Amino acid sequence: MKNVLLASSLLIMFSGCAQKDKPEIMPKDIQIKTAMLAAPEDKKEGAMVYGYDEDGEVAVLREGTNNLVCLADSPYNKGISVSCYFNELDQFMKRGRELKKEGKETMEIRKIRGEEVTTGKLKMPEEPSMMYIFYGSEETYDKTQGTLGDGQFRYVIYTP
């Protein structure tokens, strides 16, 4: 009987820990709507959108018909942050996500990608390319509508 109680207690304890580690993944339509907050108005309709599947892995949520790629908010980070960039930057951005998944820190990711660009392993656009970022606090994020009350824009220009 003691073994059954001990096993039950351990099972409950470990299942509770596992549930805490799993982030909340928003429904696909809400991820897309939130990602579009960063997109220029004239590019929203045809933008490709990456988001997160039920396992928390990056996945294509919507194929695109223009040259804009948008990324839904990461369920692993605090706050809300969505971004869009032109498809010429997609390999550079994918590489950053790969390195992050490997556990690399921001400065190490920058260094590795910089070296890979310098050696030609990672291709960058031949002309300047814009990235649009829309961010804000979780407290003003409406999970049912995909809207962000205190959102602000930030822009990054990648130059060759």
Language-model features, listed with the residues they occupy:
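Positively charged n-region of N-terminal signal peptides that target proteins for export
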Residues: 1-4
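C-terminal motif of bacterial Sec signal peptides marking the signal peptidase cleavage site
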Residues: 14-16
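Short, linear, compositionally biased motifs with a strong N-terminal bias
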Residues: 10-11
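Primary mode marks residue(s) on the alpha4-beta5-alpha5 output face of response regulator receiver
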Residues: 21-160
